[in-house]
Amino acid sequence: MSIQRRSLLQALAAAPVAMPALTGVTSSLAPTASSAASSSPKQPNTYQVKDFGAKGDGTTLDTKAIQAAIDAAAKTQGTVIFDGGVYTTGSLFLKNGVTFRVDQGVRLQGSQNIEDYPLLPTRVAGIEMTWPAALINVYQEQNVKLTGDGIIDGNGKVFWDSYWNLRRQYDPKGIRWAADYDCRRPRLIQFFEAQNVRIENLSLYRAGFWTVHICYSQDVTVYNVIIRNNEGGRGPSTDGIDIDSSRKVLVEKADITCNDDALCMKAGRDSDGLRVSRPTEDVVIRDCIIRDAAAGVTFGSETSGGFKNVKVSGIKVYHPTPVGILFKSAQTRGGSISGIEISDVFMQDVPVVMRVNLNWYPAYSYAKIPEGIKDYPGYWKTLSTPVPKERGIPQLSDVYVHDVQAVGAKTAFEISAYPEKPLKNFRFERLHLDAWAAGSIANAEDFSFKDVTLLSLDGKSVDLKQSKNVRGL
């Protein structure tokens, strides 16, 4: 990595990011004469939500009025617009050909009543099941654009609290794995079986669950979005952008603060994911900033359908994010991961530069119904369906990591797999890693390191275990 590039990254790290104020009170976004949304003249083929009865006062439930504007716009492939204000709403469903414009001075605020999010067939956390719709849905539609400089706020703390309350009941019973499925929390934005969809320039706050979920979709662009999920608390499982069994996806210029994976590839869980067998493929992620998350770039843990042809570049990851590059799965997930390229990454005070953990979080990853529980939902059976070991261990190969700089790390590598399915053909080039410890690599074959500078303060080299043909260390 060049000196010039390092200087640019350090300058970006130091520069403050302008963010819309989030006070948690509706009066902070009261309409003003100077707001962009209020002052913009109405253009032809636009549909103003207040013409359909929306109030935008922060207390009235405006779902029906906004949906009426969307339905009208769909008839002419028009644009839905808002006057400045706070619009409280439940689930909205964007339709073919609609542009949905949330301008500066507009906040869409999610209802805190779960009844305002209708149940729909979808996939959640790797299995197909019925689940509450998201706040904004592109559900089996195409040619949709979601744009503007305004705010979409999930108002999700009530759902975070309900999750933690359930965990306090479930963890002592040995059913921690069920909590994420039983506590039905709305995602912020869902693209499901959608095509040719674009979201741009918006600020996304306080998702009740995942923020942007792209599932069974293709030709999707996420551009220049700000995600802030740690306002007023730290929302559990508030992933930033999840790309789930989808193809031809571009994510560019996302600035993310969340309390789980920031940029995440998914492809189904265990027996259900193996049944569906749809990969995530042809994905480009570039020029993103991760300020606080469980990991910067994540593959898994839902790997059953596999990943291929994924290119990640221009990523900056900062403390307190604990891991920069993460591959995670379990011995019941299965799936093939190959054709991954990760480049031009800068990490500042991120404890672990790269981790591969294929036995991740057993209390969540391995579902087993205790004998004393007789009455349970059908998806518990799906989750607990055994997967033969020969199908359950994932295979990782053909991973190329290059041009990475890490400053202030604790460990460079925490990489391991299973002896019966070692990691194969990983290439590392032009790495400059400043870490306390070099770390370890286990169950690896055909790993190559070229032009790698590893400044381990403990003076030890990478600990190689049960590996062969590892060159350049």
In which residue ranges do the predicted regions lie?
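Extracellular/periplasmic carbohydrate-active domains that bind, remodel
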Residues: 2-473
